[in-house]
Amino acid sequence: MSFLVGVTGGIGSGKTTVSNIFFHLGYKVYNSDDRAKYLMERDSDIVEKITDLLGESAYRKGSLNKKLISESIYKDNSLRKKINAIVHPVTINDFHKWVNDNPDDILIKESALIYQTSSYKELDCIICVSADQDIRIKRILARDKYRNEEDIIQIMKSQTINNNKGEFKPHYIIENNGKDLLLPKVIGIVEKIKSKV
């Protein structure tokens, strides 16, 4: 049975960069966001439900209208919950199939919503990537030309979890404010994980 490692963090924190380091170190990575987008375009049941919810403009020539969906779900909490209820169960099943198809000693799951979707319960180890908000905003503005600062702050708010009870504790935290190299940090965590497997 594989040792499942979750890599999480808010938008712009650098979790994909950390996941890419794992990939280049030879580990298989399941990117929840990429797979969700793929399934939102290819799974006919999801396409039908999202079209019913948002209308024909949710898709352009078979491709997801990311700008419309992003603007819609981050401004309307109830709509975001409806979309998540459509997409998350399919993505979770897709992840389980991926795990079964890849019986490696260590597998990586990247997801911004590890705690929000309760998928943390099936992971053996969680790495949280964090960065200061102003740095995250700059990164996202440089990467996503269709977003503005207001949109980004809305997304950040939607990804925030209520941790008043202190139940959500990652095993490792990687600070990613651009001051230190990430590779040595990830390698150090890999060595610790390998000692547990």
Locate predicted features.
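Hydrophobic anchor at the beta1->P-loop junction of P-loop NTPases
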Residues: V5-V7
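Walker A/P-loop
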Residues: T16
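ATP-dependent small-molecule kinase phosphotransfer cores
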Residues: D34-P103
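ATP-dependent NMP and nucleoside kinases share a basic, alpha-helical "lid"
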Residues: N93-D101, I106-A142
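Small-molecule kinase domains that catalyze NTP-dependent phosphoryl transfer to phosphate-bearing small molecules
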Residues: D94, K121-E122, R143-K194
